[in-house]
């Protein structure tokens, strides 16, 4: 009798413990399975004007393809365009500031521009910036996955830069035209054989060069340069160097009435010009001579000739 009683006493705690453990495991399994099955159902509070207070810990789904429209059709919530009136709308679950909720974001969020920021993010019933004013308070899953409007501590997003209106200020009115009046006898030397000199000036500087008759003096020619200011300045310097090379002793605007003025008409070689290669080229010493072998000045003492007696 005592042995049987002891056996019963020993078996009762085991049975009790086993029963308790089994009951606990069965309840956990049931709760787990219930949680899995409930995640397949949409949260009716989340898709209402009240909002779900459980957040990510909710056992029901907060993300349904199609958003509120699909949930309203599935659960027969009536007209999806007119949400049910809220019984206890709140600004924030932890803030305690009560504001009436509506189908659109009509007021600014009081927590968004603070140091701690708004913890509700895209689910907030209030606008995070002026661009969200008037937008629906409840957006679908696709819109919730869109990039945020700003950082946690950011304020209003910066507007895009305005489009450029017309050409830049630096290029406005840059094109210009300049005239250089020279002796008509120098025109052939400035043009060069086959236009080699004028072509080189246009190729190096990028200007448009043309030689025309003077308006009033038949003994002069106008060299017209068209381009921007830097191009015209560079071309003018090259024309001045060319004129000095052709006739270093003849002024640019001196009429060709004397023998000295008529002499520079031809380019010629050592036999055709008495001052050919008789002086050193100043630009060659500086390394800025652009005429090369066609230069009428000596590029070094080995090319320098003695002037005619």
Curated annotation (Swiss-Prot):
Keyword entries, A-Z: DNA-binding, Metal-binding, Repeat, RNA-binding, Zinc, Zinc-finger
GO terms under biological process: regulation of gene expression
Disulfide feature: none
Disordered as annotated region, ranges: 1-36, 86-106, 249-273
One Gene Ontology cellular component annotation held by this UniProt entry: cytoplasm
ZnF (C3H1-type) ranges: 37-65, 103-131, 275-302
InterPro entries in UniProt: KH_dom, KH_dom_type_1, KH_dom_type_1_sf, ZFP36-like, Znf_CCCH, Znf_CCCH_sf
Regions of compositional bias (Low complexity) in chain numbering: 251-265
Domain KH span(s) in chain numbering: 175-239
PROSITE patterns on file: KH_TYPE_1, ZF_C3H1
Protein name (Swiss-Prot/TrEMBL): Zinc finger CCCH domain-containing protein 31
């Amino acid at each position: 009798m005592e042995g049987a009683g002891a056996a019963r006493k020993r078996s009762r705690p085991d049975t009790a413990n086993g029963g308790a453990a089994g009951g606990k495991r069965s309840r956990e399994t049931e709760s787990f399975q219930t949680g899995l099955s409930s995640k397949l159902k949409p949260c009716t509070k989340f898709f209402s004007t009240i909002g779900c207070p459980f957040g990510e810990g909710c056992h029901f789904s907060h993300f349904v393809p199609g958003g509120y429209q699909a949930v309203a059709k599935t659960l027969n919530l009536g007209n999806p365009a007119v949400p049910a009136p809220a019984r206890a709308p709140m600004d924030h679950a932890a803030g305690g500031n009560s504001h009436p909720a509506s189908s659109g974001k009509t007021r600014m969020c009081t927590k968004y521009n603070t140091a701690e920021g708004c913890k509700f993010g895209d689910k907030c019933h209030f606008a995070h910036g002026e661009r969200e004013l008037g937008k629906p308070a409840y957006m679908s899953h696709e819109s919730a996955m869109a990039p945020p409007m700003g950082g946690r501590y950011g304020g209003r997003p910066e507007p895009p830069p305005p489009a450029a209106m017309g050409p830049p200020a630096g290029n406005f009115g840059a094109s210009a035209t300049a005239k250089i009046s020279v002796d008509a006898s120098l025109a052939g030397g400035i043009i060069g054989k086959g236009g080699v000199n004028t072509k080189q000036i246009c190729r190096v500087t990028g200007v448009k060069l043309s030689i025309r008759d003077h308006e009033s003096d038949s003994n002069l020619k106008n060299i017209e340069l068209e381009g921007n200011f830097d191009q015209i300045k560079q071309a003018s310097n090259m024309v001045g160097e060319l004129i000095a090379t052709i006739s270093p002793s003849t002024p640019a605007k001196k009429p060709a009435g004397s023998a000295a003025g008529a002499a520079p008409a031809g380019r010629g070689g050592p036999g055709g010009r008495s001052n050919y290669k008789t002086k050193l080229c100043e630009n060659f010493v500086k390394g800025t001579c652009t005429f090369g072998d066609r230069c009428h000045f000596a590029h070094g003492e080995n090319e320098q000739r003695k002037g005619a007696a």
